[in-house]
Amino acid sequence: GYSAESPVERAYRDSRINRIFEGTNEINRMLTVDMLLKRAMKGQLDLMGPAQAVAAELMGIPDMPEPDDSLLGDEKRMVANFKKAVLMVAGGAAQKLGLELAKHQETLMHIADMVIDTYLAESVLLRTLKLASMKGDSGSVAGMTEQVAMTQLYIHDAADRIHKYAKEAVNNFADGDEQRAMLMGAKRFCKSTNLNTAELRKLVAKKVIAEGKYCY
């Protein structure tokens, strides 16, 4: 216990509120995938169709898309592939486990983390592209070099995280040839281009230091 007359009372109370928020976030994290799969099974959401299309793509010869020279072209491709990774893992888990998936909480958490990182990556990408278009040229980085750098850093970091979540989820429910195929798919869909992250982080930090505050 603690005394309400003590200044520490406010700190204890605020800390307790933060724990409530964190608990709610964890519950929502578990419910994210469960809700998507339930809607898919009820026919309210076409999840299996795209998932099967991704599975068919894995069985085919990898295509060699034309290079996208537009602003953040590589990152656009990466985000599109993140979505394929989510569909592959979620669809595979749903087909293998069915309604039993609800009992596999670690697998659900890995898929939920994939969904969350993919959502954030796309949000960051679209926000940066919108800023560029507001400047009158969606292909220009003039005046927003740091924003582009932060977008690249986030999406490239997300690729490693999503790959990790995908591998752990697949290893939890698949085996044999299916496991090998899905692990190869995870590696393929989470592939990132070579990026000098040290220089990009220095670029962002230099701007913040010069401004003396968070300036984005």
Q: Which positions does each model-derived feature cover?
A:
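Flavin-dependent oxidoreductase catalytic core characteristic
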Residues: G1-Y216
